[in-house]
Amino acid sequence: MNIKEAKEEIKHTLLAYNRKDVAGRYTFPRLRQRPILLMGPPGIGKTAVMEQVAEECGVGLVAYTITHHTRQSAVGLPRIVTRCYNGKEVSITEYTLSEIIASVYDCMERTGKKEGILFIDEINCVSETLAPTMLQFLQNKTFGSHSVPEGWLIAAAGNPPEYNKSVREFDIVTLDRVRRMDIEADLDVWMEYAWKKEIHGSILAYLGMKKDHFYSVENTVDGKFFVTARGWEDLSEILKAYEELGVEITENLIGEYLCRDEIARSYFASYQLYRKYGEDYGLKRLLSGEMAEEEQQKKVKMAEGASFEERFLVTGLLLSGLNGSFLDYEKLDKETGAVYQELLHLKAFLHDKKDMTALDEFTDVKKKSLAVRLEAELLNLEQQTTEEFVIRTLEEFSLTIRKEHITDTETGFERIRQLFTEMVEKRKDCAKKISRELERAFAFMKACFGDGQETVLFVTGLTRNSHAAAFIREYGCDPYFACSEKLLYRKQEKKLQEECESLLKI
C-alpha cells in the first residue's frame, strides 16, 4: 500500500482501539490490540505520517528512534528492594520506570491528552542486547515490568533488509502479533502532499516529466546511490531559502540532496530552464493581467514552437503561480473565519460590560489562553499563526476604538462590525482576483496547446491540488469544468474502445 492508504488505516485503527462504552471503559480487548508495523524504504514519510495522524485525531505522540537507546534507557535501571515471602525477608531486583514509558506519561501531563501514539522507529535495527526487549514490547506492550498506558496505540517502523545491513528479521511468533503494512513509494500520492507543503515548483514540474526519478535506492560495488521523497522535500526548502537570499544554486548543492549523479545532473539542468522560462514567459504578469495583448501573442507563438520539456515546464510554472494565489486566499479565509468566531464570543462578553475597556480584558484572556496552549503543545504552527493574527486584529480594533473616542459597548461593537466587513470585502476581492487569474491561465493554455497533453497535465495538477480544488468548489471555474468533462469523455471513450477490441478478439 502507499503512505496515504497507511495513514487512513492507522486513523481507523486508533478509532477502533479507543472505542468506549457508556461507562467510559475501552471496549476493544487490550490483548487483541496489535501494534502497527510499517515496513518500507527510507525517506517515504513513515515518521511524518504518524505526526499527521496524531494532529488530525487530536491525540498525543511520543516518537523514539530505538537505535539511539540502550537496554537501560528502554527497560529502566535495576535497583534492589526488600520483600517478604513466606515470612522470610529477601532482597530482589526491580527496575525503575522505562524512559520511554515515562515520556508517555510526561506527554499526557504536558498536553492533557490521555490517548495517543507511541511510535518506535527503526525497530528492526536494534542492538543484540535490546532485541529481546523489543520482542517483549511488541508481544506484550510492556517495557520491562511497565505497561504502555491504556488508550495509546503502539506503532513501529523499519526498513527491509535490502536497505539496511543492520536489520534483524522478526520471527513468525512476533509477526503473528503485529499488523504489518508494507509501504511503497507512490508519486501520485506524494504530489498531493507536495502541493499542500508548497514544494518548489521546479521539482513538481520535473517529476511530472521524469516520474521514474522520484524514488531510487541502489547498492552497488561503487557505493550507495539514492533519491528519496525526503530528499526532494528537503531540497525544496533549501532552494526556496537560497532564492530568497539571492544565493547561487549549484549542481553540487543539488547532489547533496539527490545522491545519484545522473538524476542530480538532470534536475539541475531542468531547474535552470525552469528559472529561465519563468523570466522569458513573464507568467506572473500574464496571470495578473499586466501583460499587453501583443506581448501575450508572442508568448503563445513561443510556446507553440517549444520542445516537449519547455511545454511541461511552462505548465508547471503556471500551476506554481496559481498555487501561490490559492495559498494566499486560504490563509485569508482562515484568518477571516477565525476573527468572525472570536467576534461572536466578544459580543456575548460585552453584553453586561459598561464600556469598551472590556475589549482589552477580552484580548488579555485570549493571550493567556494562547500561552497555555502553546506550553501544552496543543497548537501546530499554522494554528498558532492564526491565533496570533486574531489577537493582533483585536488589538487593532481596540486602537481604532480609542482613536475615535468610542466608549459605550453598543457603538463600539457596531464599529468593530464595520471593520470586520472590510476584512470580508478584502477576501471577496482576493477571490475575484484569483478567478480572473484562472481564466487567464486557461486561455493561455488553450491558445498554446489546445486540448493537448499539456492541458491535461494542467487540469490534473489543479485537481490534485487540494487548495485549488477547494477554491474551485467554492467559486467555480467554467474553463476547468469544460476541460474536465472533455477529459472524462476521453477516458470513457478509450475504455469503450478497449472493451470493443477485447470482444472482437474473442
Model region roles, listed by residue range:
Residues 1-212, 220:
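AAA+ P-loop NTPase catalytic core and its hallmark functional loops
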Residues 2, 98, 171, 186, ...:
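Helix N-terminus capping/helix-initiation residues
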Residues 10, 100-104, 242, 434, ...:
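Generic hydrophobic, helix-prone segments enriched in Leu/Val/Ile
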Residues 17, 26, 64, 85, ...:
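Sequence-level detector for tyrosine residue identity
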Residues 196-360:
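Alpha-helical lid/collar subdomain of P-loop NTPases
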Residues 301-506:
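Terminal-proximal interaction/regulatory segments of ATP-powered molecular machines
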